[in-house]
Swiss-Prot record:
Source organism per UniProt: Rickettsia prowazekii (strain Madrid E)
Catalytic activity, EC: 2.7.7.7
Entries under Pfam families matching the protein: DNA_pol3_chi (PF04364)
Protein name: Probable DNA polymerase III subunit chi
GO biological processes: DNA replication
Length: 165
């Protein structure tokens, strides 16, 4: 990976965009969170608002019948000990290496907070709006100063991912 020096801040991140349908949206989010957890990646899940945050929190409690996925939110004690931390604010209390951004309404606004973004090694964006895909890629490329460094996946109707870029 290359380093890009911009405003004296080094960026070395892997960006991935996952596009899914509205019908599979929640299931896709839960599977990606589960994959982060089982890969031993501490993660921050950035939601659009407190309602989405609580919906994810509630669904993670009942998602897997096999094993509980430990997680917490800003309403829970000991955020530093949570492997999965769900929030609607730009926080990283668990020293996560992965940032999962769900349905970003303004990705440019999030990316502009460079001191926040630079601490993550991997940034995953999940969206159900196909028309935003090209716009997301342009904004990320502008942020990183690199082109074609973004992995893009789309989910087919049976739930598997196909790499599109």
């Amino acid at each position: 990976m290359k380093f890009l020096i911009e405003d004296n801040i080094k960026f070395m991140q892997q960006f991935s965009i996952y596009h899914t349908s509205n019908e599979l949206f929640l299931k896709a989010i839960l599977r990606l969170i589960e994959k982060c957890y089982y890969s031993n990646f501490k993660s921050v899940i950035l939601t659009t608002d407190v309602h989405q945050q609580e919906m994810l929190n509630k669904n993670l409690w009942t998602y897997s019948r096999k094993q509980f996925i430990p997680h917490g939110s800003k309403f829970d004690p000991q955020p530093a000990k949570q492997p999965i931390y769900i929030t609607d604010e730009l926080q990283n209390p668990n020293n996560a290496s992965v940032l999962v951004i769900i349905s970003p309404t303004d990705i440019a606004k999030i990316l502009q907070v460079k001191e926040y973004i630079k601490v993550f090694k991997r940034i995953i964006i999940i969206t159900d709006l196909l028309e935003n895909l090209k716009e997301l890629i342009i904004k990320i490329n502008k942020f990183t100063g690199q082109e074609n460094k973004i992995d893009c996946f789309t989910q087919n109707p049976i739930g598997t991912w196909n790499k599109i870029a």
